[in-house]
C-alpha cells in the first residue's frame, strides 16, 4: 500500500489568518500559537498575513475572498464563540463551521477551522494555551500538513 501524508514543512508557503475581534483576549492567544508554529516550520514572517474581522460570523466571507485570490496556500480561521443564555451561540457556531467548510471545498484551498466553540470562558482559556493546548497552534499544523498533502496529489 502506498501512503500519502503531508509533511510539516512550511518553507515557501504563504498563509492568511482570519481572526475574529470579538473575544479578542482569547483570539490573540490563538493567533500567537498559530504564528509560533508557522515560524517554527519555516514560514517567513512576511508570508503570514493577519486579517481582523468583527466577529466569528464574518469569518467565512473574508476566508472566501482570500481563498479566491489564490495568493495564499492556506487560510487559517481563528476566533472564540462562547455560549451564553440564548440560542445565538448555536446559530453562529453552525453557520461559521458550515461557511468555512464550504469555502474550502469550493476553492480547493485548505481553509482551516480554528474557531473555538465553548460552553464557558474557562474552556476557551484552556484551549487557547493552557491545559488543553493551543488550538491556534493545532490549526497552523493542520494548514501546513494539508498544503503539503495537496501538493503530493
Curated annotation (Swiss-Prot):
Amino-acid positions noted as binding (2S)-2-hydroxy-3-oxobutyl phosphate in the UniProt annotation, renumbered to this chain: 85-86, 127
The UniProt record lists the keyword Transcription regulation: no
Amino-acid positions noted as binding 5-amino-6-(D-ribitylamino)uracil in the UniProt annotation, renumbered to this chain: 22, 56-58, 80-82, 113
Gene3D superfamilies in the cross-refs: Lumazine/riboflavin synthase
Pathway involvement of the protein, from the record: Cofactor biosynthesis; riboflavin biosynthesis; riboflavin from 2-hydroxy-3-oxobutyl phosphate and 5-amino-6-(D-ribitylamino)uracil: step 1/2
Active site: 88 (proton donor)
Top-level taxon in the UniProt lineage: Bacteria
E.C. numbers: 2.5.1.78
Swiss-Prot/TrEMBL catalytic activity: (2S)-2-hydroxy-3-oxobutyl phosphate + 5-amino-6-(D-ribitylamino)uracil = 6,7-dimethyl-8-(1-D-ribityl)lumazine + phosphate + 2 H2O + H(+)
One Pfam family cited in the UniProt record for this chain: DMRL_synthase
Single GO BP term: riboflavin biosynthetic process
GO cellular component: cytoplasm; cytosol; riboflavin synthase complex
GO terms of molecular function: 6,7-dimethyl-8-ribityllumazine synthase activity
Record keywords, A-Z: Riboflavin biosynthesis, Transferase
Disulfide topology: none
Protein family per UniProt: Belongs to the DMRL synthase family.
PANTHER family: 6,7-DIMETHYL-8-RIBITYLLUMAZINE SYNTHASE, 6,7-DIMETHYL-8-RIBITYLLUMAZINE SYNTHASE DMRL SYNTHASE LUMAZINE SYNTHASE
Primary role: Catalyzes the formation of 6,7-dimethyl-8-ribityllumazine by condensation of 5-amino-6-(D-ribitylamino)uracil with 3,4-dihydroxy-2-butanone 4-phosphate. This is the penultimate step in the biosynthesis of riboflavin.
Name the record gives this protein: 6,7-dimethyl-8-ribityllumazine synthase
Organism: Fusobacterium nucleatum subsp. nucleatum (strain ATCC 25586 / DSM 15643 / BCRC 10681 / CIP 101130 / JCM 8532 / KCTC 2640 / LMG 13131 / VPI 4355)
Lineage: Bacteria, Fusobacteriati, Fusobacteriota, Fusobacteriia, Fusobacteriales
Recorded name of the encoding gene: ribH
